[in-house]
Amino acid sequence: MAKSSEIEHPVKAFGWAARDTTGLLSPFKFSRRATGEKDVRLKVLFCGVCHSDHHMIHNNWGFTTYPIVPGHEIVGVVTEVGSKVEKVKVGDNVGIGCLVGSCRSCESCCDNRESHCENTIDTYGSIYFDGTMTHGGYSDTMVADEHFILRWPKNLPLDSGAPLLCAGITTYSPLKYYGLDKPGTKIGVVGLGGLGHVAVKMAKAFGAQVTVIDISESKRKEALEKLGADSFLLNSDQEQMKGARSSLDGIIDTVPVNHPLAPLFDLLKPNGKLVMVGAPEKPFELPVFSLLKGRKLLGGTINGGIKETQEMLDFAAKHNITADVEVIPMDYVNTAMERLVKSDVRYRFVIDIANTMRTEESLGA
């Protein structure tokens, strides 16, 4: 845990920040840089609440610098563009996802995989090129290089589309990369939560046969009837799990806490792939023999590059994919964090920044 010293920039900004490991978010005055020639400035309209926001404000991963303004599922309207910006114009709706910077010259960046760059700059909690701390979308305004700005499809809702900037790309990308996007592919989705319910929608749009695997029997009806999954497995029911052995081509595991992996490997066909997208606080135990039997693959992914994220947004708009959301006011965010940990949301919180961020607040500098 570290403390950052705020550098005064020309543009005043207002948001909600956590200041220590309690994770309590409160009003926070700060500043953002002036609009550079390749920069896009936007008024934030909506920002999704991601499980990683909770991890970061509590320093669960051990690298948080305070104060920290979370939020990397950001939708807004462009208010100013730099003199050399060509991608968008004032008045356009746009998105900012998990990244606001990378080296732009390494092999990963040149291959449109900015998220794999060793010098990636996260939307919040990272050091920007000018040495200042990045702050996220729990704020009234954002500025970013146009390369990291995403054009918002006209028919994609702003509020329920916002979580796609993390949950959408985090599930779309592995389905594409690991070859699990072919019609008829049998896909398992572990955990019917913020990531999981989007994974189901993405996989179904690709034409997959989807099995939801969850610890809660109460999720069965929603998985099958509302989200359109083809089957449901209660992973605490050994008979159900045994009956489904060697039935899946791939599994997208969205659970962000430690859990046994061996039962999931048993569900895979030979050459099957288990892809981890949840980020737990502690390392998993790896059941090596489960991998050896059947030449199975354990993989992982972390969001995606800018080109692929734009592709995902366009795909979502074409197939009418959005997140199931509960829109909340800014001052409800601490309660939302408490509910998030209890899985008491169906399935994603989205903060109505534009209508509920009271910038006249004088608290917390």
From Swiss-Prot:
Main subcellular location of this protein, as a coarse class: cytoplasm
Protein encoded by which gene: MTD
Enzyme Commission number(s) of this protein: 1.1.1.255
Record function comment: Oxidizes mannitol to mannose. Provides the initial step by which translocated mannitol is committed to central metabolism and, by regulating mannitol pool size, is important in regulating salt tolerance at the cellular level.
Similarity field: Belongs to the zinc-containing alcohol dehydrogenase family.
GO cellular component terms, A-Z: cytoplasm
Protein name as annotated: Mannitol dehydrogenase
Binding site for Zn(2+) 2: 103, 106, 109, 117
Localization, UniProt: Cytoplasm
Reaction equation(s) it catalyzes: D-mannitol + NAD(+) = D-mannose + NADH + H(+)
Protein species of origin: Apium graveolens
GO molecular function, one term: zinc ion binding
Keywords, sorted A to Z: Cytoplasm, Metal-binding, NAD, Oxidoreductase, Zinc
InterPro entries: ADH-like_C, ADH-like_N, ADH_Zn_CS, CAD-like, GroES-like_sf, NAD(P)-bd_dom_sf, PKS_ER
Gene3D superfamilies, per database record: Medium-chain alcohol dehydrogenases, catalytic domain, NAD(P)-binding Rossmann-like Domain
List of residues binding Zn(2+) 1: 50, 72, 166
Cofactor entry: Zn(2+)
Pfam families: ADH_N, ADH_zinc_N
Cofactor comment text: Binds 2 Zn(2+) ions per subunit.
TM regions (residue ranges): none
